[in-house]
From Swiss-Prot:
Signal peptide start-end: none
Segments for region (Disordered): 1-23
Recorded GO MF terms: DNA binding
Disulfide bridges in this chain: none
This protein's UniProt keywords: DNA-binding
Name used for this protein in its record: UPF0746 protein DDB_G0281301
Annotated ranges, domain SAP: 35-69
Classification via Pfam families: SAP_new25
Family label: Belongs to the UPF0746 family.
Source organism: Dictyostelium discoideum
Entry-linked InterPro entries: SAP_dom, UPF0746_actin_org
Record field: compositional bias (Acidic residues): 11-21
Lineage: Eukaryota, Amoebozoa, Evosea, Eumycetozoa, Dictyostelia
Amino acid sequence: MVNNKRKEIENQENDNNDDNDGLLTYKKFKEDINYDSIRSKELQTIAKSLGLPIIGKKQEIYKRIEGYFLSKKVKSDLINSTTNQLQQQPQQPQQQRYVLLIKDVDQLEIYFWKAFRNMIIFKNIFSNFKSKQFGYHDLIGINENFLKSYSNSLEIIKDNIKGNINHQIIRSVNDILNIIKTLKKKDNETISFYNTLFSAFSSTTTQSIKSLIFQFDENIDLWIQRMILNENLVALDQFIKFFKINSDVLKKSIEMHINPSFFNVVTYNNLKIYNYLKSINAIPTSHIKQRFSNIDLSDSLSFDCKLKRLIKSYKLLVDPTNFKKIQEIHQQEEEEQKQQKLNSDKDYIEKLNQLILELSEIESIHFTNDQLNSTIKNLLNQTTTTTTTTTTTTTTTTPILITNNNNSGDIKDIIKKYYKSIYLFFKIIKEGNLYNRNLMKPIHYYLYFKKEKSLIQLYEIFCGKNYTHYLIFFKSILMDQNLEKNQILELVSNILDIENGVPFQNIGCIYNFNLRSFNSFCKVVFSINDTELIDHLIKTIKKLQLVYDSKTKFPSISEIISTNFQYINKNEIVDFFFENYRNETTLFDDQNQNWYNGHVNIIDHYEKLMESIEKRLRLNIVYYYDWFTNVNKINEKKYNINILLDQLKRAISKPLLYSFFNDSGYYYNKLLIIFGWSLENGNEFLINNILSNEQFKQPFRFSEIIDSVLPPNKMSNSVKLIFNNISKESIESKLYQVKVKFNFSYVHGYYYDDFIPLTSTISTTTTTTTTNSEEVGQFIIGETKSFDFTISPRILFVCLYYLDRVDDIFYLFDKIPEIFNSGYFSNFTQESYLYNICSSYYLGLFINYFIENLNDNTINHLYTCLCVASRKGFIQIFQDILSSNKNSQYLLKVRTKTNQSSLFQSNLLCDMVVNSINSSNFQLSNLLIDFIDFSPKNEKVLRSKIFKSSNNK
């Protein structure tokens, strides 16, 4: 039976060439093969005859075969369409076949691209550029970091596709998946990119089909699934258009691969995908959205989002036709359950219907582009000047009318209707409740639309048992409403005085002061940077400390000022503290450590005040480091390391004003990190002073410092600053001393340990604003000083590598070959380390050096380098080896009893190939398997690994 079915399918497949109707094959499969009656083994036989995997459950194999015929139908349609288009096009003369689409191109630009594309000229021109550590050919594979780190990542991929450069960037299906997961922005560049991608990897490509690693139209259904599940609308839309996929194929693919519950999840991108598919009639009946789960539209409902995002979210969610079906479900449930409690939902439905009707009369064209691209918060806070005289100016908040339709009402009322409609919808579908973080109304909704809520009620909602959004709460009510000064002053009093300070008492334990809440409140008040407001806060707290001392224990005024000084950015507030609260705060005490602030103007002004009263500041490296990192962590900002480095530079440059507190080992660890940041940012002045300043005299261990700033692409110049005066001969002498002392047999317990002492010199070239030598810590501009440090062999070699001094490494190996016998160089050449730092250019140099200097130890290093090249996908390295008959015979042939000239046994070469397979470098994998003389058994195992790995991606 099964053989007959298989022959029918194969015959039908051949007949396709005559009638060009792939759908007949699919229909034949559906008609002749009944899922319930056919056995798994029969399906496996059919799958095998079609060249499909036979592993899996019965349902998986069935869907695999079904998807195969769907893809054949799409491919057949695409080829027929392309053929018809070509036949309909009139024949063009040969000289008119290629037309330059961009007109008026400058002649110099044409010459430039001719030279740029000519590899011989290109290499000759750029041969003088010494930085060979990283280049275009080192970009292997695609991941999220690659796509986001390179601003021209799309152009790099497109250039790679057009040039067919060894498939080094797109090596497998997994690389395409990473693209789909990441590139979702709808713009002309992304659309053009996806069209290029689909064209390059399809049956219509101009490349040889055999050279393709895969074809999109071989697995149409699976790619539809992947784009939907990754919520990539722009890729899905272009995919459907490029391959001319009709709604029947889409429906069948969704039925086969998408769980109906996927569309019940409600996110902005999920709604966009669902409504798009619905608009092209591609949603199967079984997948029509009827229930809602895991709703998260918090980003779209934030008052910081743009108006057009809110309108789009409303249209995606409260779709009138979809809402009509929900009403029908509601009525059906009411009839079945006959419960009175559903009557309340009727009111919600009636209200929502009315709002839908009102909002349907307001189209987006009634809003200006400025309004659509403004945030909700800005629109609601917008003010206009209504009265202006020679003596006074009155500014009042006014309704903002929609410019194109004065009957539509003010924008505040319209925005409220959008929000109200969405939250009514949540109530109707039984998903909204007060304690659902993703569904609760944002605090701004209450501030703008629900003003009847009291302050204490709002606090209980947003800062009560379930939420601790203190900072968001206080910032929203004090800073986001565009309030007048007197209103803010009144709010501060009310917050402090609510039921004897309830906002600052822990719920359920009234005597336990809530410091987090209070600190958040003070942070917001100080961040407003208004002298009157801060003074009002301090005076009000003083009164409350007397009145409510037994119930609410507020911190001291000194602690409040010191803790929040970091949020001050106006000099007049510093003067205010100096003149009015000098005796109530430690901020102006001698040797105090409460002055930390990230604003240069504040520090500069504060320093002058301290000098005027002849007081000094103390800089505790540990405290300052911890403060800096914690502030950035709280603010969720990326560290601006230069703020910390510049402050240290100021302090070191002013020894009469600053004293340093050094806390032994803990201090040393922090200083190492700071030194690493200095290296990374090329802060030459700070490096000079740390290394030469007596206050920081330490036996610097450079291994830890440099290791903290890897990888190399940011530190080459900084390492050069340290090593510029250290010759290979001086390094050789130090290594020789170590050899005599230890004979490279003494192995430290941890390979980071430094034991090679080196001496370097640094010249101060950085200028300063003062000529007073005391102001730069006795370090005279232009003077050269030496300093000693220790370094491990591994990091020594790393530094030489970063400085493009690989020849010096080889020189040291030649002079002191015993270094190969130690456990130290192997740490440099171990696979995990080389993988992280080594480019294809330098890896090739290492391989060639080891080939020319073969011995028992270098063979191990050679094998490690080959494994790294295999894992990274540096196919050119292996092609160079294969081009040399001598090298290929003993490097890439199996060592056996009869072939002792080869270096590596079968298991080692197998592992090398597996490295390339595991990193999806399948083209390299096949190249190696084709050349290496593996046994039939090993070859079968390796090819099976390739098949499984490529199909699992």
